[in-house]
A protein has these predicted regions:
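Second-shell residues forming the walls of enzyme active-site clefts
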Residues: 7, 19, 25, 47-66, ...
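A charged helix-plus-loop insertion that forms the helical arch/lid used to bind
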Residues: 90-103, 147-149
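Active-site-adjacent structural elements in enzyme catalytic domains
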Residues: 53-63, 105-121
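Short, acidic/polar
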Residues: 21-35, 107-118, 203-210
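N-terminal basic, low-complexity leaders that serve as flexible interaction/assembly modules and, when applicable
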Residues: 1-38
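Active-site-proximal loop/short-helix segments
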Residues: 86-91, 125-145, 176-193, 224
Length: 266
């Protein structure tokens, strides 16, 4: 099945990914999948109480989607550390920064392999990880220890390796938060962070890991709800034609999937 074979309504549906109700799959979920042909669903730990319940829910979503032409994206935020959406039976990985600061590339690879395998075994096919932002502040904040390093080289070496290991398990790895969330302490879940750094400097630092990841085969990229004034004076990155249309699609010739961060945050 190729996109050209879909109806207009089906193409529109593919643009959306929904969050399940806290109680799980309900009539509204079924309607969104079967009537509106949505592209996928993201799971949170609030949606299940056990590993068995999680797997059962994933299988139900796939069964509900059988009437559609394209498989459902079943996604999760599984970074390790404080961003852990797996049930309590699954031992969580350490956070990205602690793993990367060992400078043990084999350990980094192993963390990506384990992450990918645990998701594959559940039936999940998309992971919103790794974070390719650069850690710039010592204290814990919105991004902090979710990063793989404090400079471009560390983030590219360790973050992109994790991306590759997730991919090797057949999971789509969504790198985030383009064009870089590391220069602000503000949490984009609650505020619209504004970055005023010169574009030339951003291109050499925060933006660079994303370009490198694309060159090395990134499947998908998440665009953050971040206002980068020197790249687009008016719109946040997630709504910016200059950042998505011009930078990603035209300048970098990126053909992969582009996803926004959660629209509820806007």
């Amino acid at each position: 099945m190729v996109i050209e074979e879909l109806t207009l309504e089906e193409k529109i549906g593919q643009l959306f990914m929904i969050e399940l109700d806290e109680k799980g799959i309900d009539d509204k979920t079924i309607e969104m999948i079967q009537k509106y042909k949505i592209g996928g669903s993201i799971l949170y730990s609030k949606n299940y109480q056990s590993y068995e319940e999680m797997v059962r829910m994933i299988n139900q979503l796939k069964e509900i989607n059988q009437v559609n032409k394209i498989p459902l994206w079943i996604a999760i935020d599984q970074e390790g550390g404080r961003v852990n959406r797996m049930p309590k039976e699954v031992v969580p990985l350490k956070n990205a920064f602690d793993i990367a600061k060992t400078k043990d590339i084999e350990l980094v690879k192993k963390s990506g392999q384990v992450m990918g395998k645990m998701l594959k075994e559940t039936g999940i096919n998309m992971n919103f990880a790794p974070v390719l932002d650069i850690k710039r502040f010592k204290d814990i904040h919105a991004i902090g220890n979710r990063c793989y390093g404090e400079n471009v080289q560390e983030v590219e070496t360790y973050g992109i390796e994790v991306m590759k290991q997730i991919q090797k398990q057949g999971i789509v790895s969504v790198i985030k938060h383009f064009p870089g969330h590391g220069r602000t302490k503000k949490d984009s879940h609650f505020f619209l962070p504004t970055i005023r750094t010169r574009q030339e400097e951003l291109e050499e630092t925060d933006v660079h890991p994303f370009q490198r990841a694309i060159q090395e085969g990134a499947d998908a990229i998440m665009v953050g709800h971040i206002k980068v004034k020197k790249m687009d004076e008016k719109y946040p990155a997630s709504l910016s034609e200059k950042i998505v249309g011009q930078k990603l699609r035209t300048d970098w010739n990126y053909k992969g999937l582009v996803v926004t961060d959660d629209i509820k945050m806007l």
